[in-house]
Amino acid sequence: GLLDFVTGVGKDIFAQLIKQI
């Protein structure tokens, strides 16, 4: 669903932020 898509994108962005720190 759309919520799953948004959650997936959010997790991807969060993972990228963790890698940058």
Swiss-Prot record:
One of its GO terms (cellular component) is extracellular region. Expressed by the skin dorsal glands. The modification Isoleucine amide is found at residue 21. Keywords: Amidation, Amphibian defense peptide, Antibiotic, Antimicrobial, Cytolysis, Hemolysis, Secreted. The keyword Cytoplasm does not apply. The keyword Secreted applies. Its main location: secreted. GO terms for biological process: defense response to bacterium; killing of cells of another organism. This is Ocellatin-4. It is found in: Secreted. Has hemolytic activity against human erythrocytes (HC50=14.3 uM). Has antibacterial activity against the Gram-positive bacterium S.aureus ATCC 25923 (MIC=64 uM) and the Gram-negative bacterium E.coli ATCC 25922 (MIC=64 uM). Belongs to the frog skin active peptide (FSAP) family. Ocellatin subfamily. It comes from Leptodactylus ocellatus.
